[in-house]
Amino acid sequence: MKKNVQIKGTKSGISIFLSDKASISELQQELSQLLADQKQNPYSGEKLEVQVQIGNRLFSEEEEREISTIIHNNSQMKISAFYSNVMSKDEAKKWKENDQIFSMATIIRSGQVVQVPGDFLLIGDVNPGGQIRSNGNVFVLGNIKGIIHAGFEGDENAVVAGKFLYPSQVRIAGKVYGFDSEDYKEVADTDLFSAFVNDAGEIVIDEIHKIRKIRPEISNFQGGR
């Protein structure tokens, strides 16, 4: 008969596996019994961090608290995290939004801030004082004179593509690159360029075709909004 609760050592440390076929009350009972049996071999060191693997199910906050309490009160272990093979509706919604390409055909004027959860394609210009914030990549088919912030929530793998003109600024995650020096002031036109964070953690401006080599997954993007 397969046990509903098992404690195993893994590459990432100690894990407690809770069967997704058992009810929460069955898991609580078996977990309490298993930990009680292990008290026969007491451990006197610091509390050990464990991961709790719950399989193809989700626990409510109350259920997580109940399991945590049992482990805390009956062992020298403390939970670092609960891990599930499935995601909540909110997580699924956010994942889908971040996987989409949002597109607009307009001019982003001074004072305007456009923010999207996924990748963003703009057909038009970004004027000085205008700003785009995207959790993913940003592609602008037009002149950039405002602020472009890709990887807004911290993704340093994001890229920006467009015509970078004075006094634009590119931000990728927490990195910043400015086109506000005198060298850029007299540039009236330019080709499309790409901006990305290199292995040294710095934003690099390079030819547009380099994107495919630096971020090959971008060539597989599909979709729209």
From Swiss-Prot:
InterPro entries associated with the record: CAP/MinC_C, MinC, MinC_C_sf, MinC_N_1, Septum_form_inhib_MinC_C
Keywords, comma-separated and alphabetical: Cell cycle, Cell division, Septation
UniProt superkingdom: Bacteria
Gene Ontology biological process: cell morphogenesis; division septum assembly; regulation of cell septum assembly
Complexes and interactors: Interacts with MinD and FtsZ.
Similarity section: Belongs to the MinC family.
Primary role: Cell division inhibitor that blocks the formation of polar Z ring septums. Rapidly oscillates between the poles of the cell to destabilize FtsZ filaments that have formed before they mature into polar Z rings. Prevents FtsZ polymerization.
HAMAP family, sorted: MinC
NCBIfam families registered for this protein in UniProt: PRK00513.1-3
The protein's name in its UniProt record: Probable septum site-determining protein MinC
Biological source species: Listeria innocua serovar 6a (strain ATCC BAA-680 / CLIP 11262)
Origin organism lineage: Bacteria, Bacillati, Bacillota, Bacilli, Bacillales
Gene giving rise to this polypeptide: minC
